[in-house]
Amino acid sequence: MNIRFLIRSAARRDLESLMRLAPQASLVNLPPDEDVLTIKIARSLQAFSTSPPASAEYLFVLEDVASKEVMGTSLIIARYATPRTPHYFFEVRDTPGGQELALGVCTSGLSAIGGLVLDRRYRGMPEKRGKQISLIRFVFMGMQPQRFEPTVLSELMTPVAPDGSNHFWDALGGRFTGMSYAEAFELTRQKSRDFIPRHFPVTPISLPREECGLQRNRDQVLDSGKPEQRILEKVGFSFSRRVDPMDGALHYETRLADISIVKNGRYCRVSETTRESCGQSALLGFMHGDRFFGGQYPVQVNADNAALPGEVMALLGLKSGQQVYLSLLD
């Protein structure tokens, strides 16, 4: 393992890097908009403070310390569903003739993860940097569970056409609202989803078997999203049989307390050792003031002591006896 990478909370200096990464993924919560990203960084800095707002969003970046290059991002939204910003979904129900979609709404009890982007140049490598920047969110949630809701949601995107259209939207939402997918996407980015209860039917929508392209199941995930799907399933998430009413994105959910990274996490005191002495691998995280640092590193855990290679201690600025939150990996 090349020990020159760390994960940290986003800083103002990361704006240029985020502007470079954002176009690589069509994400509502990480758009390639300088003004929006500037606000997101400021909101994240406030979130990591000792008294975060209820609407906190936590933005993480994966950095190559040698080159000072940011190559990945991920995000936690502490309160994803509120009375002011409801979370709408379709519940997927199997019927003798196919499926039906029933509109539902949630206004509390839900945190969400998103904003996952890994620079294309680093995808498919054995170090699995994307897995690290994804799982680090659960390290922080394990450190500070009181900041989050009991249930955690991740939306896994379904395919979008080369021209930017979405078959699911064109067949359903576009028909009900008269809007294009791009128009609806922009409203969603602005956290304005009032058009859904205004225009969508309250009675279930039938999808006959011949409409197989509209029916939802766990296999309908973008190829680029399948690694994240496998990661989520391994740590405890499953398809909730709910989908986004706009684009049909699959909703993966679990209880925060049931996420394996959280269940297996604990605080340890660190000490220094050699890399050769470390026969385990772990995700770890800690706060330095209002800033988060962490990553995946070799370790040797004995009771409440975690021995780390000297180069990891130096990279993270850790001192012997300092406390970190740690979750061993298989």
Segments predicted by a language model, with ranges:
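Long, charge-rich alpha-helical interaction segments
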Residues: 172, 181-199, 205-220
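Short beta-strand-centered segments at strand-helix junctions
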Residues: 296-321
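Conserved acyl-donor/pantetheine-binding loop and adjacent beta-alpha core of acyl/acetyltransferases
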Residues: 77-116, 182-190, 197
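Conserved acetyl-CoA-binding loop-helix of GNAT-fold acetyltransferases
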Residues: 118, 124-141
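A short beta-loop-alpha structural element at the N-terminal edge
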Residues: 6-18
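Conserved beta-strand-loop-alpha-helix junction that forms the acyl-donor binding cleft
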Residues: 114-121, 150-165, 214-226
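Anionic-ligand-binding alpha/beta catalytic cores of soluble enzymes and soluble regulatory domains
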Residues: 206-274
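Active-site rim helix/loop that mediates acceptor-substrate recognition in acyltransferases
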Residues: 31-71, 75-83
